[in-house]
Amino acid sequence: NFNDKCRASVLKYTSEWRKTITRMGRWVDFDNDYKTMNPDYMESIWWVAKSLWDKGLIYEGKYILPYCPRCATVLSTHELAQGYKDVKDTAVTVRFKITKAPQAIDDKDLENGRTYFIAWTTTPWTLPSNLGLCMGPEIDYVKILDKESGDFYIFAEARLASYYKNPEDYEIIYRRKGKDFIGAKYEPLFPYFANLSDPAECEKISGQNCSEGAFRMFNATYVSTEDGTGIVHIAPAFGEDDNLVFRGSGVPNVEPIDAECKFTSEVSDYK
């Protein structure tokens, strides 16, 4: 069975490991070793966990980890690295309609219904769980007029040439730093979690203070202009960086997938 296969894999190279480590001059007490698959080791860990629990040192939280939908279990970073390889992946560019201008920018035209943040992602399946956008605080962003459509777009100035080959196709309206856009609000892409734009609704679900709700602009230094638009979409339940940005915001995570990573009834169009 599955457990026997795993056990055989662990024990397959035990003797070779012992010879190699000894030749390296590293001392290991092989005769009194332990294996994490052994019940006595597992029981020791449970004893430690119970002791910590009794002392009130354990709390429940959420953390982003690699996950296998086939096995329906989390993976260690070591397991993930074993199959690592560089591949070409599909990316999508998405526009988010701005509904409220940030306090730092005096431009009510941002709320004209034709002005959009342009974001980029290589994980489009996380877009139904989008709760925010993120800019780099010191990156230069431009608001441009797309002359063909008449719409206005905001993204990193360094990425203009990637989206517009001909400078005659657009007009730069102004330049601002990413930090100036903090707090700008936008229209949710999907209706599934639109209620989280209301801070009171966020507080009711998360049990934490929430002053502004979801679907707004954040800042983080990990955002770059090497790829995409210089604006990243944030789905806090699906990325470690995303989760850290939202931590303390009072906005609850949304996880509309089951153990096999299939959409649940919350995402009604794709269930």
Predicted regions: what is each one?
Residues 182-183, 269-271:
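A glycine-biased structural micro-motif
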Residues 1, 225-227, 265:
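Gly-rich Lys/Arg/Thr-decorated short loops/hinges at beta-loop-alpha junctions or inter-strand turns
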Residues 261-270:
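Short acidic beta-strand-loop surface patches of small beta-rich interaction domains
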Residues 27, 39-260:
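NTP-handling and nucleic-acid-processing catalytic cores
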Residues 1-50, 54, 245-247:
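N-terminal Rossmann-like or analogous alpha/beta NTP/dinucleotide-binding catalytic cores
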Residues 1-5, 177, 271:
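Alpha-helix capping and helix-coil boundary motifs
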